[in-house]
């Protein structure tokens, strides 16, 4: 049918007017004029004449267009009977469409009359063709008169008709996915084609309608070669959206309303969908990163939440704080405390904090992700009490560093049972007072652990108001167990199988806890075993300063232990911190000697143990002549001071073992130290009178 129609096609405008309406519609379909089945005869003649003027430019790219255009079926021409059913009056089209395109409709004839390049004229005229029915009827006469003088060879129209056959298929929506759809009428095929090809006609229609794309002129890309834009998918998608809008105007109102709505909803093409998908993927990625989020579980409370009270020691770090619920070392059940809450309640490191948390049921605190283990801690909801007192916002607290230190004035008596010789010997040769800073200098295997246990039990027996803290650093696990079972006090331990950081962390938090108690006016006694091992731990954990002392001791590693030991003091208006620390000597290590030399002059009380006595199994192995207390007259009465000085004069003339044997034998013969001093005073005076 295509061949016969092309042979009967006239070569001028007058011949077009003599054809019947069905023949004009078939010719318009071959030439690729959109909406030809719905035009009147005069409009068809005008559209065909306008289209024929751009033929010379189209022939130049015929080969390229034939390679790019999709293959079309042989019989695609709409029947003539479909024209009367699909024809719609121009008055039914929206008036806003006509006003919006008024400038575009008048630009094409002017460009052709002024001698513009044929490519621009053809672009403007092909844009005008599907819109011509929306203009007034009197315009068709002027356009027809201009077209009668412009004839084109029939061969050019034939080649252009073949090239436009595939384009018309995409324009009219008559490209069928099955062979049985060719017999449908033009209107039904048009509407069905719109629905079937809606998903993928963006790319196909873009290649077929680039010549008629009304936006190509606005884009301004390759104006002189209009066919170059057929390879641009972006312009093709623009053309598909424009053409769908035109067909929604020309398609009548029976199904056009639903078609318009569906086409508006599906207007985004593949590129738009891809952009949305990429945006959604980015948002999902941000959400996943947000879920990884903080390691602290900060939950909002509701009325139905069940709060669980927790208590522990507050450990304030650089940017956060934790309540150590399992002791003085970090644990999995620690509770997070924000710095804002720390500032609000004036909290300090070492405070005993009590407050509720909102635990999550069935949630594990250990999370595995990203190849590393993360711990998620519950956050403290509020603070109920601090150091046994109700929490107050912005309290006025005493600072430990501003308290006035004094020499010890109140004595801590160690004498309990008459049969316990060790505490009685210490009570005589090295009396201990509240706020004492004492060193127990001991070689290995000299019985320092037994001395510490006896001192702890004696203090707790005679002075129950004192808060006793036994700090064991780098000790044997069995010794820790023995201390926990034998000492009635707070045992804070870090065994030697733990890293050096744990030793230093435990010691720092323990001394800060003691300071907080002293600020409240309490008397605290800290027994440290040992200061030498604590110095070794700081030497390993502290960052190197570059100044190494003899024995491999870093100079900066000695300051934290001295700060720990220097916290001991007697406060002027109440409260005291007593520290008795052991120091190892005669170990054969130069490092131990350096550490001991740093602490030798810092204490105001020294109890020295002897290896020579310990090897002979003489306990307590106390070197009587080398032990003593500074300012002991502040702890003893005047009579006691006189008697002890006389006793020391006698013992200083004896050897180490003889002096200890004499002292212990006299102590065993008496029931108390007071009775012993009475005996010593009588014996010394009597022997002196005999001389």
Curated annotation (Swiss-Prot):
Which keywords, in A-to-Z order, does the entry hold? ATP-binding, Helicase, Hydrolase, Nucleotide-binding, RNA-binding, Transcription, Transcription regulation, Transcription termination
Name the residue ranges with Basic and acidic residues bias. 50-64, 120-158, 188-273
Domain Rho RNA-BD, first and last residues per copy: 307-390
- Assigned EC number: 3.6.4.-
Which segments carry the region annotation Disordered?
A: 48-303
- InterPro entries, per the entry: AAA+_ATPase, ATPase_F1/V1/A1_a/bsu_nucl-bd, CSD, NA-bd_OB-fold, P-loop_NTPase, Rho-like_N, Rho_factor_ATP-bd, Rho_RNA-bd
Pfam family example for this protein? Rho_N
Q: Which GO terms describe its molecular function?
A: ATP binding; ATP hydrolysis activity; ATP-dependent activity, acting on RNA; helicase activity; RNA binding
Residues annotated as transmembrane: none
According to the UniProt entry, which residue ranges have a biased composition of type Low complexity?
65-92, 105-119
Q: What GO biological process terms does the UniProt entry carry, in alphabetical order?
A: DNA-templated transcription termination
Describe the protein's quaternary organization and the partners it interacts with.
Homohexamer. The homohexamer assembles into an open ring structure.
* Function description: Facilitates transcription termination by a mechanism that involves Rho binding to the nascent RNA, activation of Rho's RNA-dependent ATPase activity, and release of the mRNA from the DNA template.
Designated name of the protein: Transcription termination factor Rho
From which source organism is this entry? Micrococcus luteus
